[in-house]
Amino acid sequence: MKLLTTDYPSPGTVNHYRIDSEQRRWVEEYQGKVGLMDLKAMVAAMASDPCWSANLHGLIDFSDVELDLSANDILRLALVLKHEEHRTRGWLVYVANNSTVFGIVRMLSYWSRNSERLRIFNTREEAETWLEHNMDQTPPNFREVESSEAAAALRNVI
């Protein structure tokens, strides 16, 4: 298992991830006030990690965070997540223990076209249990995005 804590531009924010190849998943954990730059930096750090694989499942824990994102920020992040080097073919499981974070994650799932393979839970325990039971199932309706389509969308955002 690999644990990485990186420096992020937002003061009062603590973010880290770990990649567990044996369990075929990565875990992202956030604390404090988190904005678009924090999330994009995490995505970029994981994508450049030699342990990263698009075949991993993801558990993203937003239970101890205040998300500071506009609707435009959510759209920008969704387009970054659709870019080939950041895409995953596995399940995306989020922990969102309040309605604001839940709504933001739903918007993100819609704009990144991940609604079919994304699940949101109130607690970390519920999320981990669900992921363990569904780890061997292929997420439904997974659609490969052509790299030219993703590149064009990314150019328009960045």
Residue ranges and their predicted role:
Residues 2-158:
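Amphipathic, Lys/Arg-enriched alpha-helical "gate/interface" segment within cytosolic domains
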